From Swiss-Prot:
Oligomeric and partner information: Homotrimer.
AB hydrolase-1 domain ranges (all copies): 26-264
Protein name: Non-haem bromoperoxidase BPO-A2
Superkingdom: Bacteria
Family: Belongs to the AB hydrolase superfamily. Bacterial non-heme haloperoxidase / perhydrolase family.
Stored Gene3D superfamilies: alpha/beta hydrolase (3.40.50.1820)
């Protein structure tokens, strides 16, 4: 299987599993928690059909990548992404992040610039800053909320995932119509196959402050979010994000949950392909 080495922990290398398909302008898809690059399958198919080269990879600790105990912060995640781009020598690339993956996009552009990047897309994003503080009243939740997630993951991450996906896909509304029990089970299996250290550390990255990164986004951008998102509510994320980046193309998908890559794939793909074609 194809891997890119991004670091070392003691005697073992830290390797990222990736896939690279198609020809044309490269589109790099960066997955969310607690999934893997395979969560993009409905977008990958549409992008390949439209003539793009599609690269997916599993973030450290997730999917088929190595499961180190360290490196779970956005500076390291962005450095890992930079290694992927440099190793594959990608030029004129489009970075597309979903959920947690939007953090890599913002931090990469802020830290490494856009010499290799043509466009960026933020789908169901966590920007600009999820933590509710005195200087950030638009934040989604206080510190105690995120501490509770970490505690739940450490206590029994498998039980946590079951509850997490209920609201990830809004199963009370979409199960049996927009998503099958089997697809939900696959998401759970993917989450369970990831590393414990990654699962426990990831929630502490969600409240990273990206407010200083946003002004450095100097290429065309897309912000797309579902109005029914219970995981990252739109009023705390995309709508505030768009005010900070008014030049971005902005799309709201009516009623879509957080996991809209699957439940509302047609709407997502239509908006993404239109953005790429401009």
């Amino acid at each position: 299987m194809p891997f890119i080495t991004v670091g070392q922990e003691n005697s073992t290398s830290i390797d990222l599993y990736y896939e690279d398909h198609g020809t044309g302008q490269p589109v790099v898809l960066i997955h969310g928690f607690p999934l893997s690059g395979h969560s993009w399958e409905r977008q990958s198919a549409a992008l390949l059909d439209a003539g793009y080269r599609v690269i997916t990879y599993d973030r450290r600790g997730f999917g088929q990548s190595s499961q180190p105990t360290t490196g779970y912060d956005y500076d390291t995640f962005a450095a890992d992404l930079n290694t992927v781009l440099e190793t594959l020598d990608l030029q004129d690339a489009v970075l597309v992040g979903f959920s947690m993956g939007t953090g890599e996009v913002a931090r990469y552009v802020s830290s490494y610039g856009t010499a290799r990047i043509a466009k960026v897309a933020f789908l169901a994003s966590l920007e600009p800053f999820l933590l509710k503080t005195d200087d950030n009243p638009d934040g989604a939740a206080p510190q105690e909320f995120f501490d509770g997630i970490v505690a739940a993951v450490k206590a029994d991450r498998y039980a946590f995932y079951t509850g997490f996906f209920n609201d990830f896909y809004n199963l009370d509304e979409n199960l049996g119509t927009r998503i099958s029990e089997e697809a939900v089970r696959n998401s759970w299996n993917t989450a369970a196959s990831g590393g414990f250290f990654a699962a426990a550390a990831a929630p502490t990255t969600w409240y990273t402050d990206f407010r200083a990164d946003i002004p450095r986004i100097d290429v065309p951008a897309l912000i797309l979010h579902g109005t029914g998102d219970r995981t990252l509510p739109i009023e705390n994320t995309a709508r505030v994000f768009h005010k900070a980046l008014p030049s971005a193309e902005y799309v709201e998908v009516e009623g879509a949950p957080h996991g809209l890559l699957w439940t509302h794939a047609e709407e997502v793909n239509t908006a993404l392909l239109a953005f790429l074609a401009k």
